[in-house]
Amino acid sequence: MKSPVELNQYFKYWEITKDLIDQCIDIMLNLRQSGHPGGSRSKVHGMLTTLLSGAMRWDIREPGKRFADRFVLVAGHDNPMVYSTLAVLNEALRIKYNQTGEKRYLNYKGQEHQLVWEDLLTLRRKGGLPGHAEMAGKTLFFKFNTGPSGHGSPPAAGEALALKLAGVGDVKVFAFEGEGGLTTGATHETLNSAWGLGLDNLVYYVDWNDYGIDSRPFSSIVHGSPDDLFTQKGWHVEGCDNNEDWKKFTQAYYDLLVTNHQKLVPKMIYAKSRKGRGYYVYDEKSHGVPHKRNSELFWKTKLDFTDKYSVQFHDFGAPEAESWGDQVKQAIFYFT
């Protein structure tokens, strides 16, 4: 992994990429009127820091690469964040290929395995992108099929153990989850097993936003905090109090994987966030309910983007179209 000093020059580009991903999440869910905006938005900084800092070794052109690190979305219902991230990064590759004609920008398995923004129009529709994480087709980036909170914890540890037993313990498994998923029994068993098995190639990222689907914050009903839990289980823990601070976030990752690296000890990094960041509906209210299609709140999230980058959305402020076909056309205009 590169040091925060080396990465500092890229933070301005990460910020732009983050904003593009946010827009993709919003437009995709605005069209489909289904999905999870709050946890998706709150994890974008963590996703980009993991993928672009060198913390995770991966190749977007070859998601099945044998010795690349693995990614498990523990709670698979936050996959709009992953879909949007892949769409933005793949669009950058598509632009570079169109500019240069160089094949190094192409997916090694062909376009049918490259998730692009057009695929976001198919969320939760037959033959389109599934509502939960599935390791197939254009979403081979996922390394396990997951759905509810905590679901991916045991598989993530199992993959880390398998890699160790195969003699490639330097291949890491990154597991993404919000702290709500830490309440499941399977997660507690995973934390115990990972420590006992010395899975230092398992890296848990916890999006610490204090809310799930209920109105009560987790801190009011669960004793202790995420860092308390992992520390008590013997894990090496690093974190930052503001996931929007790229410098502090990358420093925490660098301390975890490089400066303070511990052998045979599983790792956890946390970043405090706001569920629904930038969505104008926060905490539990943002969990699984997108804004009404083309509502005032939806357009408010677009206004932030237009003001920041001096761009305009086609028919800004327009109401939703009457037919599904015309609604899809509207979404295409918003993406382009």
State the predicted function of each range:
Residues 4, 20-21, 154:
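Extended, solvent-exposed polar beta/coil surface segments
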Residues 1-15:
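Non-catalytic, mobile gating and regulatory segments of ester bond hydrolases
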Residues 137-331, 335:
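Glycine-rich ThDP/TPP pyrophosphate-binding loop and its adjacent helix/strand module
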Residues 14, 25, 31, 42-197:
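Cofactor-binding active-site loop characterized by glycine-rich and histidine/acidic residues
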Residues 26, 32-36, 54, 61, ...:
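Conserved, well-structured beta-alpha core segment at the onset of a catalytic domain
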Residues 37, 41:
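Gly/serine-rich nucleotide phosphate-binding loop at the start of the catalytic core
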Residues 18-34, 207:
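N-terminal capping segment at the start of a domain
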Residues 15-18, 336:
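Non-catalytic terminal/interface segments that mediate subunit docking, oligomerization
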